[in-house]
Amino acid sequence: PAQTAELWDNGPRWWLLPLRDAAAVRGLRPDMGELRDWTNATEATGVAIYAPEHADGHDLVVRAFCPGDAVNVPEDPVTGSANALIASVLAQRHQLPGRDGHCIASQGREVGRDGRVHLYVDDAGVAWIGGQVQPVIDGTVHW
């Protein structure tokens, strides 16, 4: 059966689309014009598409497309808000892969990155995310 995208809001509004096959997620070549029109019409940040995959130390494959006016990034290599939302939804449905509320998402390989997002959903249902970062700017803001 076909999967259905659902619109969720965790601050940013994300369309989430689960697929059964990680290879299908990795092989996506979406029409960015159509995605831009859809996300603009629904005032969404973007579309996050994911599937389980237990390989190379991760449990999920995630891709996030944000070509609309809200972000204007065709594909985000690592997306904290989308990953946190996916983890929350999967935990609510008792479908979070991994163990004891923990899992690791792979994102960004298709755009030349190999991001790993560590996801944890605690007993209260709060999603926590973490991982390694590559700082691109450092400083202090005074106000």
Whereabouts are the PLM-identified features?
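Active-site proximal loop and beta-alpha junction motif in alpha/beta enzyme cores
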Residues: P1-W143
